[in-house]
Structure formats: C-alpha cells, structure tokens
Amino acid sequence: MLGRCFPPDTKEKQQLRMTKLCDPAESELSPFLITLILAVLLAEYLIGIIANGFIMAIHAAEWVQNKAVSTSGRILVFLSVSRIALQSLMMLEITISSTSLSFYSEDAVYYAFKISFIFLNFCSLWFAAWLSFFYFVKIANFSYPLFLKLRWRITGLIPWLLWLSVFISFSHSMFCINIXTVYCNNSFPIHSSNSTKKTYLSEINVVGLAFFFNLGIVTPLIMFILTATLLILSLKRHTLHMGSNATGSNDPSMEAHMGAIKATSYFLILYIFNAVALFIYLSNMFDINSLWNNLCQIIMAAYPASHSILLIQDNPGLRRAWKRLQLRLHLYPKEWTL
C-alpha cells in the first residue's frame, strides 16, 4: 500500500483532512522494472483469487448441499474469503493509485484502503494459524490429558475462535490509523550545490506500533510456528516408529506421513516469509518506491496464491474436485466442435 506525504507543522498534519500531496518521491526503479513488478503482482493476485475462489466454491457447495460443513472446511471458507477480498483489494488499490493518485490520496479513500488492507491481512494470518492449530490437535499423537480434552472440544471451539479473530483484526485495523505518518521536507539543502532535495520522514508511535504488531502479527505467527513444529515432530516420530517396524518406505501410510511433513514444512516457511514481509512493509522501514518495499509486496501477494495451491494439492477432496474441473474444461471445447 502506498503512503502519503503530509507537510509538517501545518493544519493538514493536525486535522488530517483533504491533505495536499507532496510531489511523489523519485522512484529508484527503471520503468521496465516497475512494469515487470506490476505484471508479477497482477499475475499473483489473479492466481490467488482463482485458487481461493475454487476452495471457497467447493466447501460452500458442500455447506449448502449437506446443510453442514466440516470444521476444516469452515476454516478454509473463512480463509479463502479473506484472501479473495485481500487480493481483490490490493489489485484495485494498485489500479487506482497508478491511474488517479489525487483521488487515492483523499482521506476517506486512503484510510478505507489502509484499514481494509490491515484487517484482511490480519484475518488471513489468524485463520491460517487456526487451520494449523486444528490440524495439530486432530493429527498430532500426544497423550496429555489437556491435549486430549482439547481434541474433544476443538470442533465446538473453532467457530467462536474464528469470529473472535475477526473482532481482534477489526479492532487492530481501526487502531492503526495514527501509528505511522509519512512527512515531506521540501527544503533539505544539498551542500555541494545551490539546490534543495525533497526528503521523506516517518513519524511512528512506538508504543502503539509494538502493541499493534504483537497482537496482530506476532501472536498468530508464534501460534502457527508452535503448532506446525509440534505437528512435524509428532509425524516424524510416528514415521520413525513405523520405519522401525519394517513397514517399508513404499507403504501408503508411510508416504502419507512423509507428504504431511513436507506440506506442513512448506506451509510454515511460506507463513513466516509472509509475516516478516508484512511486518517490514507496515513498519515503513524502506522508501515507498524502493526495491525492498516492492519485494515485500511481491512476497505478500505470492503467499495467498502459493499456500492455496498447496492446500488444493494436499487435500484429497480438493485435489479430486480440481481434476474433475480440469476434465470438464478439456471436454467443453470438444463438445463445441461437434
């Protein structure tokens, strides 16, 4: 998301109403590289929307047909809806900020994008963390009484936890408005010449920033890391036990366990990269038009798409539905030619 520039020590800084823009910061990137980045981002957005739309459609159809949906399916519906909305929002924001910067920089428009962006990102982080938590409780092999009690109650807890995550994400997105503001200094002298250079400064509420990121990003990140790591360790231990019983490396159960370990490891890596990129991006560590800032955007756009594709490949029901869809798409052109 692009930032705005507020001239310091003005009424606009105090009132934050219909602020005049400073001239956009000079881009460090060539036009070709900017075009390439935009093309990559748009491709990632479209892939993410298609993949998450497929996941949502399959589980929504199951929900309507059976008047019920599995707990994992419920989480996936919440997750896919948040990601479709997020990818669509980011694609719309790039389009508006590139074609009508003055309209995008109006207070109402800018803050609508800012709040929606953070809300949907935090929802996505929380829903993915609850999905990892659910898989951990259902699959991991631990015999602790508290863990067994949690496994028995997890189905009833998940709907409440999902809506609690929505409330937490919305609260944090509303709280974020005055955490960081970018200011423009129009009269920074260049000592080697008689000219001046435009510089951009950030003012950050450190206490608010710490509270904001701890509950919004760090908490679901820690939960995801812990549950995914414990699940991998449990699966690895069970796999070693199966190997010691000489079941053979080609045993379907052994292959299923190894596949689950790989999938969980990929999920963990993707989640960490996305959370770190989001943290850096929202912290305003780099200039708006810098290569590092654009790299964070690419990572954030790639995560929903790649994670959803892995979910389709790893879930037998979704994988079968995807193959049926591919088969129908291949048959339609043949029917049209008859």
UniProtKB/Swiss-Prot annotation:
Keywords carried by this UniProt record: G-protein coupled receptor, Glycoprotein, Membrane, Receptor, Sensory transduction, Taste, Transducer, Transmembrane, Transmembrane helix
List of glycosylated residues: 185, 194
Transmembrane segments: 31-51, 75-95, 117-137, 157-177, 206-226, 263-283, 292-312
GO terms (BP aspect): detection of chemical stimulus involved in sensory perception of bitter taste
Gene Ontology CC: membrane; plasma membrane
Topology, Cytoplasmic side: 52-74, 138-156, 227-262, 313-338
Record keyword ATP-binding present: no
Subcellular localization, as worded in the UniProt entry: Membrane
Short name of any one Pfam family annotated for the protein: TAS2R
Cysteine pairs bridged by disulfides in the record: none
Record carries keyword Transmembrane: yes
Protein's membrane topology: Multi-pass membrane protein
Annotated InterPro entries: TAS2R (IPR007960)
Segments in the Extracellular topological domain: 1-30, 96-116, 178-205, 284-291
An example Gene Ontology molecular-function term: G protein-coupled receptor activity
PANTHER family, alphabetized: TASTE RECEPTOR TYPE 2, TASTE RECEPTOR TYPE 2 MEMBER 39
UniProt family annotation: Belongs to the G-protein coupled receptor T2R family.
Note: Most taste cells may be activated by a limited number of bitter compounds; individual taste cells can discriminate among bitter stimuli.
Cited function: Receptor that may play a role in the perception of bitterness and is gustducin-linked. May play a role in sensing the chemical composition of the gastrointestinal content. The activity of this receptor may stimulate alpha gustducin, mediate PLC-beta-2 activation and lead to the gating of TRPM5.
Record protein name field: Taste receptor type 2 member 39
Taxonomic source organism: Gorilla gorilla gorilla
